[in-house]
Amino acid sequence: MKKLIKRREIPIGNSVSNHPLLDRLYRARHIQNTKELDRTLKSMLNPNQLYGIEQAVNLLVEAYQPQQKIVIVGDFDADGATSTALSVLALRQLGFSDVDYLVPNRFEQGYGLSIPVAEMAIEKGVQLLMTVDNGVSSFDGVAFLKEKGIRVLVTDHHLPPETLPPADAIVNPNLSQCGFPSKSLAGVGVAFYLMLAVRAKFRELGIFTAETQPNFTDLLDLVALGTIADVVPLDQNNRILAYQGLMRIRARHCRLGIIALAEVANRNVEQFTSSDLGFCIGPRLNAAGRLDNMSIGVELLLANEMSKARELALDLDQLNQTRKEIEAGMKLEAIKICQNLTALFKELPYGITLYQPDWHQGVLGIVSSRIKDQYHRPVIAFAQDSEGILKGSARSIEGLHMRDVLERIHSQHPNMILKFGGHAMAAGLSIREEHFADFQHIFNQTVADWLDEEHLQGVIWTDGELNSNEFNLETAELIKSVGTWGQGFPEPCFDGEFKILDQRAIGQNKNHLKMLLEPKQGGVLLDAIAFNINTRLYPDLSIKQARLAYKLEINEFRGNRSLQLLVDYIEPIDE
């Protein structure tokens, strides 16, 4: 799909960095003063600003003496796994002796604190149930537990429904009555804040002193991993959490499981970036919840012996390889469906709805994301569960709030969607198979009402051109050092015109393009690589010049470090 390369506007304002390039990058990301660049823990928001935190802390204080059975119920993604592991570790460090956890199986119980999951917790003897990264939409499960006289503490970050579950306490920055400034906390961030508040209460009660209290900065590796892997916007507070965790990972002050996953991914933790967490560690951890059971991922993060961590990391790596194979097949089928839709309607629908009965439920979200990236359309991919219900995973584009779209469809067609939930850019839902054709039409029409043609034009936003003297390792190191980059605080991407002096396909499937480039202004020769190219278009030796969108990357090979351009998009220039 042809895309537009556009440059980010740099707002007029005071300088925020003495370095001209950094000043440009920061202001393009709406940084207005140097305080917003502070990544120290002292600048972290206070837990007491979270609505419901006092009630939540009191529930845990009451469960401390006499010791009550606490069961943590997590989610089956990386945010859920890190939230679960963090809560188990923190509560045990605080002195809670009877802490257990449950992670619903995607294929058996589905998402959230359902009644079957509540029954599993009761079998474990639960006296206080605490959700992490889920629960705000789990009305039935919470009500079921309350009827049994069991107290429930919900911690979540997902957008709440109109009717909240009848929990004893709910901590969620997205509650309408919550004034917490950072609405982008991941589930693991919410859990971390609750544990900080409990520790503070225990100090107040004399259970700990400042000297004897557990050091919860040791849990920031989990906070960083869950925050980056869940692709939540990196506002200043999340940047602090992610950066502090990343620094601890680089110093190897982290879970053995993270080190083991880095080993199987052939990554050096001492050089870790947020991209490594998001694209190497996160997918392997997520593979457990996609194809098997996320308990594998939680056990990896709880492992205190390297041999056990390595064993589980190898299991996750194999699951991830299997996931890639399943994904490749599903993506080909999805592209074929899109081609058929285009042939049928003369153009691709504004909102793409895909369904194959035998598709793997655990891989739907990735396929939706891949098709969304390829066609720049909102996408929902469905598969059938064991009871004949269609489970869907939705991914959106800028300008379309996916959960709001589903809310509108639900309000206008109350019997269409069985249940749904999510965020602006990602959501999940269930419908009946007989409603698929109607839903396909309604979703497309709703998206068409919401978006115009301009929204459907894929755009690559860049930070403009680099000068010849900026193509060096020092610039790449500088950009790496001032991250943490991610969602809402994007890694710098540049554009410019280049001569293509050499190009060749590389990789096992010959789907990566290696190039030798010279900037239009001359002065330097540059190695470049473009991953996952369209092999029907490239290599093309007739293309001698192109405008490229690219990032700076440090290529390390056999102890040597060199600059490499990581090319995101190629726009050929006619000579």
From Swiss-Prot:
GO terms for biological process: DNA recombination; DNA repair. Signal peptide: none annotated. Keywords: Exonuclease, Hydrolase, Nuclease. It is an enzyme of class 3 (hydrolase). GO terms for molecular function: nucleic acid binding; single-stranded DNA 5'-3' DNA exonuclease activity. Disulfide bonds: none annotated. Its EC number is 3.1.-.-. Gene3D superfamilies: 3.10.310.30, 3.90.1640.30. Disruption phenotype: Slightly decreased growth rate, higher sensitivity to UV light, slight increase in sensitivity to mitomycin C treatment, no change in the spontaneous mutation rate, no change in the rates of slippage in tetranucleotide repeat tracts (i.e. phase variation). A double exoI-recJ deletion strain has a 2.5-fold increase in spontaneous mutations. The keyword Cell wall biogenesis/degradation does not apply. NCBIfam families: recJ. Single-stranded-DNA-specific exonuclease. Required for many types of recombinational events, although the stringency of the requirement for RecJ appears to vary with the type of recombinational event monitored and the other recombination gene products which are available. Involved in genome maintenance but probably not in phase variation, which contributes to the virulence and disease. Belongs to the RecJ family. This is Single-stranded-DNA-specific exonuclease RecJ. It comes from Haemophilus influenzae (strain ATCC 51907 / DSM 11121 / KW20 / Rd). The gene is recJ.
